[in-house]
Amino acid sequence: MLPVFISYILSFQVKYIYKASDKYINNNIKTGIYIMRIDSQSIFLTNITYDDTADIVRWRNQKFVQENFIYQKNFTPEIHNKRMQTMVESGQVIQFIIWERKANKKIGSVYLRDIDYQNKKAEFGIFIGEKDYLGKGYGKIATRLIISYAFEKLNLNKIFLRLLTHNKRAFKCYLDCGFIQEGLFKQDVFIKNQPYDVVFMAILSNTPPA
């Protein structure tokens, strides 16, 4: 019988299930805890595995997903597998697949990257890869689940993110989830030889629930 921790955070039921097995990749290096699944009423999150490669590659190469990434080069299975080997398995990245509960369907991914346990911070990222599931609030729920996971279970103090200024839908979602804009970096990146401004947003662990 697996031990279960149930917490009511940000108005969502969040269930963390732990199992000490290397079958599940997202290993909290400091505690040796392996996270299998995080649940809410309408979606659930599971650890990313090599079996998700085809979905990740397909999602990342769709125009409506790719155009909102700062990194917009073609995404390949080789890039994904290298990321798994060098970043996910090392604990630098904790990444989940987002499932829509009713259809039991994979719809996207959410992750924390460059996790810095000393300074208690990490960078946040998310994308919905199935177009029919955009605009239904699933991204917002997944964002809130990861915020609560990062603060409650990883004991982080700050989650930050970067986004291109044209991504208005994501900007509103992040504001609704409690992020605040901390800066605007003018012409910070070049994509296809064109300069783009980048918004920097963050949320702290003592931020009141959104």
List the predicted regions and their residue ranges:
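Short glycine/proline-centered loop/turn elements that form peptide/ligand docking sites
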Residues: 139, 143, 166-170, 187-192
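Glycine-rich acetyl-CoA-binding "A-motif" of GNAT/NAT acetyltransferases
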Residues: 104-108, 169, 195
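A short, well-structured alpha-helix characteristic of acyl/acetyltransferase catalytic modules
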Residues: 25, 30-82, 207-210
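Conserved catalytic-core motifs of GNAT/GCN5-like acyltransferases
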Residues: 160-163, 180-197
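Acetyl-CoA-dependent GNAT
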Residues: 73-132, 204-206
